[in-house]
Amino acid sequence: MSVTRILPAPKGIFLEGTAQVYRGDSANVFTATGRKDVSYVGHLRGYRDLSESTNVDLGFSYAFGHNDVGSAFHTQLYGLDATLRWKPLRRSIYHHFLARTELVWSHRDQLSAALLLPETQRAFGFYTSGEYRLNRRWTVGARYDRSDRARQANLTDSGFSALLTYWPSEFSQVRGQYRFARYAEKQDANELRFQFLFVLGAHGAHPF
């Protein structure tokens, strides 16, 4: 179940709140082992125009649910996110910039590996990324991420990505990405990814 509502706010600020309740599993984060095991998610979003070309989005999130250890063990997630957009109105198809970042704190109840006693594992992770449109056809971007593991916060993984996007037309997109990852076990990984998108039919609405 999900409810979204626009909240009262000072002039010039758009404020939106979302609350969700659901029962089910969400990968390794939440697990419903009992009939009454439900998870709760809340998000508060604020938007403001800084100028006719620049705007900012700020958000706070909270999630609570049962994890895979059992119904008596919970995981809590706290998140902060921010998005900055620069898009000049008269030249938006030639130049624009988009920056995003998100920080997440995890508090996970579990049994200690040594004594099998209840403990709370506290982990932190974040990512930050940016994309800049060079001209009508080319966009460059980069992303950095770093996160502790939820079950073992003393183990930290990190990674860096660089991407290049080419737009042959408004109906197609070609993207190449290189990613380097360094895992807590001192193992490195190098990945090359390629993506091709195309659209059939009428011209769709432009994204915000």
Residue ranges: model-predicted function:
Residues 80-82, 166, 188-208:
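Outer-membrane beta-barrel "beta-signal"
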Residues 29-35, 68-74, 150-157, 183-189:
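Solvent-exposed loop/turn segments connecting transmembrane beta-strands
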Residues 5-7, 21-25, 48, 62-68, ...:
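Transmembrane beta-strands of outer-membrane beta-barrel pores
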